Protein backbone atom coordinates (compact mmCIF):
# COMPACT_ATOMS: atom_id res chain seq x y z
CA UNK A 1 0.00 0.00 0.00
CA UNK A 2 1.44 3.42 -0.88
CA UNK A 3 2.40 5.93 1.75
CA UNK A 4 -0.35 8.41 2.68
CA UNK A 5 0.16 11.98 1.55
CA UNK A 6 0.03 14.84 4.03
CA UNK A 7 -2.85 17.26 3.42
CA UNK A 8 -1.22 20.48 2.23
CA UNK A 9 -3.79 22.69 4.01
CA UNK A 10 -3.06 21.01 7.33
CA UNK A 11 0.68 21.27 6.72
CA UNK A 12 0.32 25.07 6.65
CA UNK A 13 -1.92 25.30 9.74
CA UNK A 14 -0.60 22.77 12.25
CA UNK A 15 2.79 21.84 13.70
CA UNK A 16 3.66 18.78 15.77
CA UNK A 17 5.94 19.37 18.76
CA UNK A 18 8.74 17.08 19.84
CA UNK A 19 6.49 15.48 22.45
CA UNK A 20 3.77 14.81 19.86
CA UNK A 21 1.37 17.61 20.72
CA UNK A 22 -0.29 19.55 17.90
CA UNK A 23 -0.16 23.35 17.98
CA UNK A 24 -1.92 25.94 15.83
CA UNK A 25 -2.46 29.68 15.69
CA UNK A 26 -5.45 31.26 17.40
CA UNK A 27 -8.49 32.00 15.24
CA UNK A 28 -10.28 35.34 15.08
CA UNK A 29 -7.56 37.82 14.15
CA UNK A 30 -8.36 38.50 10.48
CA UNK A 31 -10.98 41.24 10.81
CA UNK A 32 -13.62 42.66 13.14
CA UNK A 33 -11.19 43.37 15.97
CA UNK A 34 -12.58 46.85 16.61
CA UNK A 35 -15.22 45.16 18.79
CA UNK A 36 -12.67 43.32 20.90
CA UNK A 37 -10.85 44.64 23.93
CA UNK A 38 -7.07 45.03 23.89
CA UNK A 39 -6.85 42.10 26.30
CA UNK A 40 -8.82 39.83 23.96
CA UNK A 41 -6.61 40.75 21.00
CA UNK A 42 -3.44 40.25 23.05
CA UNK A 43 -4.58 36.80 24.19
CA UNK A 44 -4.96 35.70 20.55
CA UNK A 45 -1.22 36.09 19.88
CA UNK A 46 1.06 33.11 19.55
CA UNK A 47 -0.01 29.49 19.32
CA UNK A 48 -2.27 27.17 21.24
CA UNK A 49 -2.04 23.47 22.00
CA UNK A 50 -4.98 21.49 20.66
CA UNK A 51 -6.94 19.16 22.90
CA UNK A 52 -5.55 15.63 22.94
CA UNK A 53 -8.36 14.02 20.92
CA UNK A 54 -8.32 16.78 18.30
CA UNK A 55 -4.56 16.47 17.98
CA UNK A 56 -4.77 12.71 17.55
CA UNK A 57 -7.32 13.11 14.75
CA UNK A 58 -5.21 15.76 13.00
CA UNK A 59 -2.14 13.51 13.13
CA UNK A 60 -4.04 10.42 12.00
CA UNK A 61 -5.97 11.86 9.06
CA UNK A 62 -4.14 15.00 7.94
CA UNK A 63 -0.50 14.63 9.03
CA UNK A 64 0.14 10.88 8.76
CA UNK A 65 3.91 11.24 8.33
CA UNK A 66 4.46 13.72 11.17
From Swiss-Prot:
InterPro entries: Ribosomal_bL35, Ribosomal_bL35-like, Ribosomal_bL35_CS, Ribosomal_bL35_sf. GO terms for molecular function: structural constituent of ribosome. One of its GO terms (cellular component) is cytosolic large ribosomal subunit. The keyword S-adenosyl-L-methionine does not apply. Gene3D superfamilies: 4.10.410.60. GO terms for biological process: translation. The keyword Ribosomal protein applies. Keywords: Ribonucleoprotein, Ribosomal protein. Belongs to the bacterial ribosomal protein bL35 family. NCBIfam families: rpmI_bact. This is Large ribosomal subunit protein bL35. The gene is rpmI.
Amino acid sequence: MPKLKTKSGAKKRFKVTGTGKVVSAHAGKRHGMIKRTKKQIRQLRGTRILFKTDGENIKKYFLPNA
